[in-house]
Structure formats: structure tokens, C-alpha cells
Amino acid sequence: MSALFPTYNRWNIAVQSAEGTVVTDVNGKQYLDFVSGIAVCNLGHRHPHVQKSIEQQLNQYWHVSNLFTIPIQEEVASLLVAHSAGDYVFFCNSGAEANEAALKLARKHTGRHKVITFRQSFHGRTFATMAATGQEKVHSGFGPLLPEFIHLPLNDVDALKQAMSEEVAAVMLEVVQGEGGVRPVDPAFLQTASELCQQHGALLIIDEVQTGIGRTGKPFAYQHFDVEPDIITAAKGLGSGIPVGAMIGKAFLKESFGPGVHGSTFGGNPIAMAAAKATLEVVFDPAFLQDVQEKGRYFLARLHDALASLDIVKDVRGLGLLVGIECQTDVAPLLPLIHENGLLVLSAGPNVIRLLPLVVTKAEIDEAVDILTNVLNNANASAVL
């Protein structure tokens, strides 16, 4: 009997080892990993540059607290601001913590309380980020949520215009909703959101927890659009599997986040910073990012060609290497079949298969497309769905 709370619907796969794009279970079966730790292992498993950086830091010091100046924090912060619209960084341990920090900063700076977010969004499971999340299933059973969070339909310009006022502290969104089904924001809607924030003195917060750190072929996904957020949040891929989160903000916000306003015991931990520094050194290389964009286009084209004739496939969409296959009904019965064929994928909402490779080769993309085509063809023929 497990001593763990049953908070996860775990797969029947026990991992023995992982390296690059391959996961090996305790029975010796190997899987091509298109889950990537849920958009965490952006450089694959145990990338040698990241592993070397961690090992070097382990031989120096592990933790001293944020009462000290920690040089490697400054190095990672400099990398983040050099590749984003931000000027200052607050380090924490997860995406939820980064989003909590963003929400606190928005309220503190503006003196306002209302925050606009969007249906099917996902921002975390703490009380503030749960309230920000636009999914009822995340709210269920927890009683009254924190007030003043407004959930609007994504890409509905009229609804956003009606909701905006001088009482709104921030608009918070993902440019591609990951947990919400790999749903991209409309560029015109994002531009309108940015303009409305400027007009009303609200902050634009872009949650890049899943879309950031090279996932879409840019350092951050908002950089595909003509907007500049006031606050950016990052986590997941930032540490290549070592827990780390970051909130990145513009210079005018600095005075609102002074000593004692917020903090994190483990935020900016030297081991996490070593992982983040090495990760960013690889991911922010222009050649790496260009390769992600090219492979993303290749992957989408292959999926469109292979799946276009299948009735059960409603849509194939994505940005860079954040890709979703939307099916007509629930995809849960399909996941074990795909796994049995040696490909690890996961869902995004009830009817989307989510694919999150990053350092894969075109040959591995071809292999994955063949497996997906085979399973979806069989499902299409036998009406498994």
C-alpha cells in the first residue's frame, strides 16, 4: 500500500532511468518521451551541461538563505531580463508561487483588487492562483474562493472591454492555454488586452509557466506577438527538472516589492540556480530556438498530413513544440494505447492529446507520428472513443 496521498491519477509505468528523449521503466521497456515532465525537461533528461553545472554547485554550497548575496542568482536574473521585457526578477520554487508573486505585486502596485483572467486558464492550485484559474474542476470542494477574480471567455474582445475599469489591477493570461487544451490567444485580442491595460492603468501579466523557456521557439511565447507585458512568470522548463520559478517585472514596479513585502525561503536556491543558468545558456542560443521553430513547423505539417482524413480528429494546433491534437470526444482511453506503443503523451483537458517534446530529432518526430497515426486509425475504425 502506498503511503502517498492519491492526488494523482498515476500511469502504470514505474521509471528506472531517463536520458535525453528516452524514459526506461523498471521492466526495461523504453519510451519516446513527448511529455517532458509536463513541459519541464526542455533539454531532455539529464542534459550534460545542466548536470555538470549542478555538480559544480554541489561542491560549493547548497543553501545559505536570501540574507546573503548569491552571485549565481544575479547571473540567472541577468539572463532572464536580457531575453525578456523585464528588468527585475523574484525567484521562487514553482509556477504557482511565481503567479502568486505576480498577483501580490499587481495589487500592491496598483492599490486595486480586481484581476481579469480567462476561462479554461490554469495558473496554479494555491488559493490565489486557484481563484485565478478559470476551471471549475480546480475550484470544486474548497468553499468560497478569494473574491475579485473575473473569468472571461478567451478571445472575446467585447467581454474584455466591458469588464475593464479603473478598479482592475491586472489582466492575467497565457498566450497558449496549456492545461486548457493548447488554445492559442488571438493576436488581435492580445493587442487589445495590452492597450486596455495601458488605458486603465492595469498591469498585463503573461503566465509563461508552460509556454516559456524556449517551448515555442522564442525565449518567451509573448515574443511572437507585438506586446510587452508588465510582468512575466516562468517555471517548469527553467530548471530542467530542478524546482525553480521566477517572476520578471518592469523597472517601475521595483519600489512596490521592497524588503519584507514578499519572500521565499528556498527561492533562488543555489542548486536550482545552477540548473537554471545552464538551461538558459543552452535554450537562449538563437540556433537552438530556430531549431525549435523549424521542428515545430515540421511536426505540425506531419500531423496534419497523417491525421487530416480521420473523423475523430477535430483539429491539430500549436506553437513551436507545444502541440495539441483535438479529438471529437474523450482521449483518456487512448493514452494507455499510445503508451503501450512506446510513446509517452498526455492530455490537455478531456479531448486534447498534448505533445511536449523539445530536443527531439525529426526521426523521432516521424516515429511519434507513426505511433499516433496507428492508434488513432484503429480508434477511428473501431469507435474506441
From Swiss-Prot:
One of its GO terms (biological process) is L-arginine biosynthetic process. Its cofactor is pyridoxal 5'-phosphate. PANTHER family: ACETYLORNITHINE AMINOTRANSFERASE, MITOCHONDRIAL (PTHR11986:SF79), AMINOTRANSFERASE CLASS III (PTHR11986). This is Acetylornithine aminotransferase. It catalyses: N(2)-acetyl-L-ornithine + 2-oxoglutarate = N-acetyl-L-glutamate 5-semialdehyde + L-glutamate. N(2)-acetyl-L-ornithine binds at R125, S264. The gene is argD. GO terms for molecular function: identical protein binding; N2-acetyl-L-ornithine:2-oxoglutarate 5-aminotransferase activity; pyridoxal phosphate binding. Its EC number is 2.6.1.11. It comes from Geobacillus stearothermophilus. The keyword Protein transport does not apply. Keywords: Amino-acid biosynthesis, Aminotransferase, Arginine biosynthesis, Cytoplasm, Pyridoxal phosphate, Transferase. InterPro entries: AcOrn/SuccOrn_fam, Aminotrans_3, Aminotrans_3_PPA_site, Class-III_PLP-dep_AT, PyrdxlP-dep_Trfase, PyrdxlP-dep_Trfase_major, PyrdxlP-dep_Trfase_small. Pathway: Amino-acid biosynthesis; L-arginine biosynthesis; N(2)-acetyl-L-ornithine from L-glutamate: step 4/4. It holds the Pfam family Aminotran_3. HAMAP family: ArgD_aminotrans_3 (MF_01107). It comes from the Bacteria. The modification N6-(pyridoxal phosphate)lysine is found at K236. The keyword Amino-acid biosynthesis applies. May also have succinyldiaminopimelate aminotransferase activity, thus carrying out the corresponding step in lysine biosynthesis. One of its GO terms (cellular component) is cytoplasm. It is found in: Cytoplasm. Belongs to the class-III pyridoxal-phosphate-dependent aminotransferase family. ArgD subfamily. Gene3D superfamilies: Aspartate Aminotransferase, domain 1, Type I PLP-dependent aspartate aminotransferase-like (Major domain). Pyridoxal 5'-phosphate binds at G95, A96, F122, D207, E208, V209, Q210, T265. Binds 1 pyridoxal phosphate per subunit. Homodimer.
